[in-house]
Amino acid sequence: MVPLEDLLNKENGTAAPQHSRESIVENGTDVSNVTKKDGLPSPNLSKRSSDCSKRPRIRCTTEAIGLNGQEDERMSPGSTSSSCLPYHSTSHLNTPPYDLLGASAVSPTTSSSSDSSSSSPLAQAHNPAGDDDDADNDGDSEDITLYCKWDNCGMIFNQPELLYNHLCHDHVGRKSHKNLQLNCHWGDCTTKTEKRDHITSHLRVHVPLKPFGCSTCSKKFKRPQDLKKHLKIHLESGGILKRKRGPKWGSKRTSKKNKSCASDAVSSCSASVPSAIAGSFKSHSTSPQILPPLPVGISQHLPSQQQQRAISLNQLCSDELSQYKPVYSPQLSARLQTILPPLYYNNGSTVSQGANSRSMNVYEDGCSNKTIANATQFFTKLSRNMTNNYILQQSGGSTESSSSSGRIPVAQTSYVQPPNAPSYQSVQGGSSISATANTATYVPVRLAKYPTGPSLTEHLPPLHSNTAGGVFNRQSQYAMPHYPSVRAAPSYSSSGCSILPPLQSKIPMLPSRRTMAGGTSLKPNWEFSLNQKSCTNDIIMSKLAIEEVDDESEIEDDFVEMLGIVNIIKDYLLCCVMEDLDDEESEDKDEENAFLQESLEKLSLQNQMGTNSVRILTKYPKILV
């Protein structure tokens, strides 16, 4: 038995699609064709069109498709008056095919697509991102745009320099123009000053302009006074001065006596140094040693006054700076080291106020403007020279600098590379082999302190027969094992070899003398002497290389420290010059204005005494033609 409800459902299911299809075809859009073209499953429209209670859902789907509710007005009455059946397939409205169908069907109509995109949650989710991008673009434009907030001026500038000049000339004014304003009217600021240079210095707080930069840490400041305070912080922090200067422990500069007994070394230094210097070193024994005793070579070239007492920056700029050139030298470095330590010592908490006030003459104004300008030029050139030398030393080729200066190149392994065979054949003059072979693979070892002539080859016995050459080749194979990190060594023949290649400091296991002497008639003593010579050469060269690397690192550290000191002095002098320029401008303007006023008054008095007195005008009259 088939239930009656199933039969009714089948009859209504076969009849309803005709009405719905006809209604949709009348509108000019066939939904089934659209779904087939897009490759999407066609929905069961029979149950939707037959359900009267679900009519608002049909309106939603047609709006999503782009029909804008026209289907409801043109729907046939048969489709709407059909029997109401329970709704079973509501999942078709929320499935992804309908969303994609709406997106694809909206393409012909642009107006409906804009409405649907504005109401969809995806569009609302993407709109804030676009707003943020627009806000960023506006922010970039606002970074360039600067508004004048002086009494609602509202002028717009694209550079902070122009805004600052506008404030100084238009709003602050000058006394000669009778429009001088010493009170700040920027926004809510109510700062009051007494001089024009004070208000112009205060205006830098409101303008995003930082022209004064620190050469040590690359920070920028708005006023030279702020940079001065920052430089004092560099000195007091001890980033440069707290580091202990002098030779490192265990380097070539220190002797074995200093390692064994440091007290004897201190007593010997105090005996050799004059009593004034010894007393100064004893007085500062509790503080870290900043200035070690000068070497003998440097102390001979320095004057006696420079060795005995420290000096202030003002005294150096006015008295002794003309004796030096703006080029780095040990004498100038040693002299500059005597300027800053008193400032460092006396800035501590354990020093009395009298000593502190006495040492702060480094930052007192005791020089003329011309002297400060010349000193600023000197230290600026010195800083550039030292910076360029340091950059060239760091970026230049290490092989070229070492070969040109006579330094020993340091290899990555303990094995020192042998010199080229063709370069040493010119000493003997035995053969004519091209000098261009293997020039890029091996770096020649140049010893500037030791002879490189035929003295090294005098002690080597001559090799006459071919058997000796064959035995020597066999011996070199045993003495020089294969090293993977070093390139292949050149082959040495009996006619062209002048110096044996050096071995490692740790010689590998050599074969016994029986095997060496069994094949040839060579003497075992000569065999032992060859190995011993090559080993000692390698040890000496490696020690020299290590000591020279340590000395270079110490010299580089001293150079970097001195460059920092020079930069601090240069920045300080630049701040002094800028302050003096501001003061001179204000004073010169006031003096010029006073002089003009007095001259005008004198002329007016003279003209009043005469019969035909002419009234002097403050402005030029307009001439009408």
Swiss-Prot record:
From which residue to which does any coiled coil extend?
none
GO MF term (any one) = zinc ion binding
UniProt cross-references to Gene3D superfamilies, sorted A to Z: Classic Zinc Finger
Q: Where is this motif: Nuclear localization signal?
A: 228-234
Q: Where are the zinc fingers (C2H2-type)?
A: 146-171, 182-206, 212-234
Query: Where is region (Disordered) located?
Result: 1-138
Kindly state a single biological-process term from the GO annotations of this entry. Answer: cellular response to alkaline pH
Motif YPX[LI] motif 1: positions = 450-453
Fill in the PTM field for this protein: Activated by C-terminal proteolytic cleavage. At neutral to alkaline ambient pH, the signaling protease (probably RIM13) cleaves RIM101, removing a C-terminal 8 kDa peptide to yield the active form.
Q: Which SUPFAM superfamilies match?
A: beta-beta-alpha zinc fingers
Which PROSITE patterns does UniProt cross-reference here? ZINC_FINGER_C2H2_1 (PS00028), ZINC_FINGER_C2H2_2 (PS50157)
Q: Where in the cell is it found?
A: Cytoplasm; Nucleus
**UniProt short sequence motif YPX[LI] motif 2, positions renumbered to this chain:** 620-623
Q: Does the keyword DNA-binding apply?
A: yes
What InterPro entries does the record tag this protein with? pacC/RIM101, Zap1-like_Znf1, Znf_C2H2_sf, Znf_C2H2_type
Q: Result of mutating residue 189 to S?
A: Abolishes transcriptional activation of target genes
Principal location listed in the UniProt entry: cytoplasm
For this record, the Gene Ontology CC terms, alphabetical, are: cytoplasm; nucleus
Ranges of compositional bias, category Polar residues = 77-94
Q: Where is the composition biased (Low complexity)?
A: 107-121
Family in the record: Belongs to the pacC/RIM101 family.
What is its quaternary makeup?
Binds to DNA. Interacts with RIM20, which probably binds to the two YPX[LI] motifs and is required for proteolytic processing.
- The protein's name is pH-response transcription factor pacC/RIM101
- Identify the species of origin: Saccharomyces cerevisiae (strain ATCC 204508 / S288c) (Baker's yeast)
Gene behind this chain?
A: RIM101
